[in-house]
Amino acid sequence: MHGLLLAGLLALPLNVLAHPTESHSSGISRRAIDITSYRLPQISKYTKSDAVPKQDDESFTTSSTGDDNVSSGDYVTTATDWLKKTLPKATYRLVNDHYIGDSGIGHVHFRQTAHGIDIDNTDFNVNIGRDGKVFSFGNSFYDGEIPKANPMVKRDFSDPVNALQVAIQTLNLPVTAKPENVKAKPVEGKENFKFEGTSGAFSDPKAQLVYLQKDGGLVPSWKVETDIGDNWLLTYVDANKNDKVHSVVDYVSAAEYKVYPWGINDPTEGNRTSIHLPWFKTLSTDWHIDGKGWYSTTRGNNAIAQENPTGGPEYENNYRPKSPLFIFKYPYSEAMTPPSSYRDASITQLFYTTNVYHDVLYILGFNEKAGNFQVNNWNKGGVGGDFAILNSQDGSGVNNANFATPPDGQPGRMRMYTWNASTPERDGCFEAGIVIHEYTHGVSNRLTGGPANSRCLAALESGGMGEGWSDFFATAIRLKAGDTRATDYTMGEWASNRPNGIRKYRYSTNLTTNPHMYVDADGLTSVHAIGTIWASMLYELLWNLIDKHGKGDVTKVRPVLKNGVPTDGRHLAMKLVLDGMALQPCLPNFVQARDAILDADKVLTQGSNKCEIWKAFAKRGLGVGAVFNPSKRTGSNELPAGC
């Protein structure tokens, strides 16, 4: 769910093998339905910090108290006033996911409304600087004529049960909803329902009446939510006639432990070792406690890991290893077969890798307020109740992985498959890059557009960047002490048994090895192909910052920060990319995401890395003169003055 985007389905993050993904359970047939034609339009605008109008009016300054409580801090009021001044005729609601990030920037998100109904693909995000003024903002509000008739008064919209049936039939969903059996039960909110009496979905489908901004107008629509495992869909069905699907969003985008330690990507890079008490002691808890009790198994505050051979929705009662002494040491070798013979080692590895990554990201700013995955948020903000569900050896497919990301407060779900391109087959849990790739889908979807909005990477180029961010973090984390900018890396090489990995090119700073440029995105319809271009740019950024600041001690797991700034170039690049996600608008494009990274550096280091960032992007055609157009992009190698 890339933001309820399942990194799966038509854009399975690691499925670029010659043969299609095999599926043994639920999901949309790849041959029958192509939901890419239903993508949301890319209409967001981002006003970077340099372009924000001067704020002389005292009404747009606040005291920077550092307190992100709405009742005592003014940053939400400042953001609201800015929206009123920018779009005085707009009606809207405040989304309840605002927070002050660890860089000191306040992030506030709004949703446009009409007649009290959400216009679901309209967002306005305001970033408030430490000085209390507007730092930057994004906007995709509808600026056309609002329908005069209030559908809530006339009740001239269709039955939500019919909308559910249209979604099922149009998308060929494996859900049964017979009219005589299905009841639409009202839940909290205007025209908001949960369907009872269906079968085939992982949870009861839902529907909410919304407007959708499309083709220059507003279309009343039922937003039908169906979780079918491989896909977690928001299907926008015409609410007037129930005869058309307007758009589709998919949320799915992919003690002591004997494991491949952090930094070892796969069995070709090192050996399994015993790791004792690996969690960061200054964080809230260790990995096996959630405030309610201790779990002597692969369960805790951040994640719950288990096998899932059937590929079904149940997980709480599935098998997971237990150790009263919290010693999770189980046999594994590449020669072992079948995979079920080493399920304990697989589950333990998945639990370990995910928890370490959670802790690293926490230090870099992806914490409770920012929408991370935790059952207990320890009164530090955000919405709890949402650890990551980790399914090892998931039986719903092979040769792939995916991650479903609903909004903050609902658990994310990772499905890790086995790969059959080798003999014996291989388990993706033992390739850290795949696990990190999938979990990063959860990160990018929670940060972009705010933790409560999981559809902000649903446009084609936005979704491509989602794949690129996932590849970037997986690659940055596996760097070795002897690596230089001449070092190239693949993705998915071990699991897929392909020497060149599963991307078109290796990640490289050499333009012969990897010639990708910004304009290569023209004509592409695959988020993974677009993502490789974005990740190639970020790989350039990574090495520019490492060359300036060093890569630090790569044998150390915990990032080292001084005054909130990573002291090495590797973690600095990761931090700037994370902060950029929180700044950029909903449904961003390459140009906007680049500007957000530059703005992130301006906040974090007062712009001291401006030229390193510009040189990275300009090298691959995203320089000063680059212009986004979905059909014909304009490339540029131009650098700003002074660089």
Curated annotation (Swiss-Prot):
Subcellular localization, as worded in the UniProt entry: Secreted
Residue numbers annotated as active site: 438
Entry-linked CDD domains: M36
Pfam families with a match to the protein in the record: FTP, Peptidase_M36
GO process annotations (BP): proteolysis
Leader sequence segment: 1-18
InterPro entries reported in the protein's UniProt record: FTP_domain (IPR011096), Fungal_virulence_M36 (IPR050371), Peptidase_M36 (IPR001842), Peptidase_M4/M1_CTD_sf (IPR027268)
Cofactor note: Binds 1 zinc ion per subunit.
Keyword rRNA-binding carried by entry: no
GO cellular component: extracellular region
Region (Disordered): 47-71
Biased composition (Polar residues): 60-71
Binding site for Zn(2+): 437, 441
Entry EC no(s): 3.4.24.-
Alphabetized GO MF terms: metalloendopeptidase activity; zinc ion binding
UniProt enzyme class: hydrolase
Keyword annotations of the record: Glycoprotein, Hydrolase, Metal-binding, Metalloprotease, Protease, Secreted, Signal, Virulence, Zinc, Zymogen
Keyword Hydrolase applies: yes
Names of the cofactor(s): Zn(2+)
Ranges of Basic and acidic residues composition bias in the record: 47-57
Glycosylation-annotated residues: 271, 420, 510
Proregion residues excised on maturation: 19-254
Top-level lineage group: Eukaryota
UniProt family annotation: Belongs to the peptidase M36 family.
PANTHER family, A to Z: EXTRACELLULAR METALLOPROTEINASE MEP
UniProt name for this protein: Extracellular metalloproteinase 4
Organism: Trichophyton tonsurans (Scalp ringworm fungus)
